[in-house]
Amino acid sequence: MKQLIYQLLPRLWGNGRFSGIDQSSLSYLKDKLGMDWIWCTGVIRHATRSGAQPQKVVKGDAGSPYAITDYYDVNPYLADDPDARMEEFKAMVERIHDAGLKLIIDFVPNHVARENVNFGADDDTTVHWAPENDFYYYPGEPLRLPVKADGYEEFPARASGNVFSPAPGINDWYETVKLNYCDTHTRTWDKMLDIVLFWAGMGVDGFRCDMVELVPPAFMTWLIASVKRKYPRMQFIAEVYEKAKYRMYVEEVGFDMLYDKSGLYDTLRAVSCNGMSARAITWNWQSLGDLQPRMLNFLENHDEQRVASDFFCRKPEAGYAALAVSLLLNDAPFMLYFGQECGERGMQAEGFSGRDGRTSIFDWCKVPALEKPAENVLARYSDILFWSKIPAFASGKTYDLCYCQDGEFNPDRHFVFARSNGQMAFLVAANFGRTQEFTVRIPPEALEYLGIKAVRTVYTIEVPEKDYVLLRIQ
């Protein structure tokens, strides 16, 4: 069954607090957009320059949600009353569940903020590595940061989140420290399991696991199995990029969903913007095979540029063809990034990030489209999200029709497929080029595979530029 996930940063939603995720917001997500899950990014307490206890090594003013300072706390700035922040978090969880939604938060296993309180207290700092150390050290060497850090000193230096060096560069994750994992069980494993179980006990329904390729698969296998023994319905989503390892992360490690950034996302972006042939969409699903239902499809998230930005499609309407394929091609889960459905462009210059086509995760900023949505864009998104929940799309079979087309059908710019659950059937035609009329033929073998008897098998349709057409054929 099709699962829809909505990612948002609570600090940029509504009033910027847990209380801003209120009944009105949840009704919008559930009733207007048909969401099943809400992924709240930036809940667990992270390094920030704001508030009563500002940290010194921070990217931006608000700080990255992925530089965790305390794994057992939430950000005070998200609470109306900072002293009651955990109670306010639990109240938000209850509202989410009462609305028929489930909650995802981030689990960041690879690294922590430099001023983290949960790790390193018992480390032997005289050696570079020891199996029971939480961090990697550079004995005798101070940390040399690429930026000024308000008098912060670290001696000996520790390895940063993505680089083994006492002198990380400006493009490195210098505000974080890499955690030490072994391929065999250590106390770091136990600490991380305790953290995940803590949040599961708070009512969290799933974890989006950050950069899992940087931690041992053996650890994630053990952690997922351990959590699911107590919480069998807990969902784990992996941020992964190596397609060759997809099957391992599903079948051996145990993840429920995987980012398909390196597959369908990259393909659709290249077809939409860089002239790649639409044939690549077929090649991508063929390479995935039976893994398709485990892929998390998306066109935006906090790491990627906005579809409507000058770096991608330049306007939201030019992303409709890609949206139709990403959302409707199969019954894989689909993720929407807050403001995407309203036409957000992400073209403001924002502190640490600058003008990069993204909504900054490092600074206090605005999402203008949430305040003044493009109503025509919101209507189109609401409509196609509704169709994605129809049984033919939510759990039906897919038949790629591109191979059997000819004439004015352009396999480099057009992509057509049919979906059916045996009772209802639909034809979807996506056009990545200019407005064009073309004919789509449905062969007998497609009808047999889909279990339908269509009244017509030849359709001449006009599909607008960078758009799609959806037709019911049974």
Q: What does each of the following model-derived ranges do?
A:
Residues 8, 40, 71, 96, ...:
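Conserved, mostly hydrophobic/aromatic
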Residues 456-474:
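C-terminal beta-strand-rich structural cap/linker in extracellular carbohydrate-active enzymes
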Residues 7-19, 67-86, 174-188, 204-214, ...:
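The substrate-binding groove and active-site-proximal loops of carbohydrate-active enzymes
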Residues 194-197, 205-295, 325, 343-383, ...:
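Active-site-proximal helices and loops of the catalytic beta/alpha 8
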